[in-house]
């Protein structure tokens, strides 16, 4: 589009320039005619000639430039036409070659169909049989190829001539009268199992080397497996016995005067220690210490709003009298019934303390009794009168009844009555 517009513009310029030149020529001719008819001054004629020459030069330059532009445009147009013609010609040539190739392929495809249907056996002659060559076997062909073109290059062997021994005059063996030197015997190196065995002395032995040396010295590793153990002895919990602790507190020895303890049974996994009620101590004998050294007050323990004040007076009943075979132990129901039968109640304040305090008081009282006994044994010789008073006070403390107020709920008492205590 741009080239066509340029061509149109150049053609118009040429036409206009030619028209201007023609108009100037006509105007000059008119002026000449008029000048002939009318007399004019020489100066005016000179001016007119200068203007004429100027206009003519401008018109000539414009004409020349327009012609050059026209020539360039024409050349480009011709070249473009030539290139387009060449491209079209190339495309036509390619199409013709493609058509020729397709025709030849079609001819080749139709050749076997036009062949006669006679079998090759009927057409075979002596010349055809003579020209037949059997195909060689693959093994023979492969062997021939290997011989012609070996896969591996031949090994290059380099031979060295033996070095003659040079006689050295500094040695005695080199003298002409001395015997010849015998050749040294060839020594072979011992084949090592590893490339680094015993060669690198500066290398530190690794941990694997120490393990190997450890097992090499012993030649084997014996392991014992416990798969043949008989686990039937450990199936029942009845046979498992927990012996009493050696370091028993001193207050436990009071109950040892009666019958012997039964061995404790270990609980099974499905049982719970918390399901059983904690068994109280067998006896509440608090007279093992002197009344002058420590006299406990009335401890109270509050559990709930609906508490019942129970006055605990430990007394020896007829059921606790020793029998012929041994000391007789009262049952839990008899003990609890004796606790409930007491009607002396006192109102006390609620105190949320644990029952562990009672066991702590028992241990504390027993420790005080042992301290008082040791104190009496040391100072028995000096103060005999004081020792007799302490013994009398001790007897009085045994005869005196220790009152302990324990506040428990009715539900706990009923549960305790229903549970059987094992001593």
Swiss-Prot record:
Residues with PTM Phosphothreonine: 149, 248
A single GO BP: vacuole inheritance
Annotated effect of mutating residue 178 to A: Impairs phosphorylation
Alphabetical UniProt keywords: Acetylation, Membrane, Phosphoprotein, Vacuole
Modified residues (N-acetylalanine): 2
Cystine connections: none
Composition skew (Basic residues), residue ranges: 182-192
Pfam families reported in the protein's UniProt record: Vac17 (PF17321)
Ranges of compositional bias, category Polar residues: 116-131, 199-211
PTM sites of type Phosphoserine: 119, 178, 269
Chief location of this protein within or outside the cell: membrane
Protein name according to UniProt: vacuole-related protein 17
Organism: Saccharomyces cerevisiae (strain ATCC 204508 / S288c) (Baker's yeast)
Taxon lineage: Eukaryota, Fungi, Dikarya, Ascomycota, Saccharomycotina
Name of the coding gene: VAC17
């Amino acid at each position: 589009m741009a080239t066509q517009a340029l061509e149109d513009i150049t053609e118009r310029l040429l036409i206009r320039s030619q028209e201007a030149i023609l108009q100037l020529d006509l105007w000059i001719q008119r002026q000449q005619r008029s000048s002939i008819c009318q007399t004019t001054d020489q100066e005016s004629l000179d001016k007119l000639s200068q203007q004429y020459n100027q206009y003519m030069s401008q018109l000539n330059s414009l004409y020349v430039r327009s012609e050059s532009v026209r020539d360039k445009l024409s050349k480009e147009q011709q070249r473009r036409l030539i290139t387009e013609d060449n491209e079209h010609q190339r495309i036509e040539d390619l199409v013709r070659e493609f058509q020729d190739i397709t025709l030849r392929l079609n001819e080749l495809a139709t050749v076997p169909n036009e062949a006669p249907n006679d079998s090759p056996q009927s057409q075979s002659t002596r010349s055809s049989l003579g020209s037949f060559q059997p195909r060689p076997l693959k093994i023979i062909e492969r062997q021939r190829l290997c011989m012609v073109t070996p896969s591996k290059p031949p090994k290059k062997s380099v031979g060295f001539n033996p070095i003659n021994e040079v006689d050295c005059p500094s040695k005695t063996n080199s003298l002409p009268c001395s015997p010849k030197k015998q050749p040294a015997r060839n020594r072979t190196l011992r084949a090592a199992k590893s490339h680094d065995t015993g060669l690198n002395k500066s290398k530190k032995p690794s941990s694997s080397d120490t393990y190997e040396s450890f097992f090499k010295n012993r030649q084997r590793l014996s392991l014992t497996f416990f798969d043949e153990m008989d686990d039937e002895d450990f199936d029942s919990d009845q046979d498992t016995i927990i012996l009493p602790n050696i370091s028993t507190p001193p207050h436990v020895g009071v109950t040892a005067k009666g019958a012997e303890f039964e061995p404790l049974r270990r609980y099974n996994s499905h049982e719970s220690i918390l399901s059983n009620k904690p068994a109280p101590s067998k006896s509440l004998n608090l007279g093992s210490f002197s009344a002058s050294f420590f006299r406990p007050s009335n401890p109270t323990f509050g559990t709930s709003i609906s508490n019942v004040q129970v006055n605990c007076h430990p007394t020896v009943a007829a059921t606790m009298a020793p029998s012929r075979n041994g000391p007789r132990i009262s049952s839990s129901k008899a003990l609890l019934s004796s606790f409930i039968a007491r009607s002396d109640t006192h109102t006390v304040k609620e105190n949320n303390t644990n029952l562990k305090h009672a066991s702590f008081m028992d241990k504390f009282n027993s420790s005080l009794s042992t301290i008082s006994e040791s104190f009496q044994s040391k100072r028995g010789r000096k103060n005999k009168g004081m020792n007799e008073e302490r013994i009398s006070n001790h007897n009085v403390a045994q005869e005196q009844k220790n009152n302990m107020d324990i506040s428990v709920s009715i539900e706990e008492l009923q549960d305790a009555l229903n549970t059987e205590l094992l001593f």
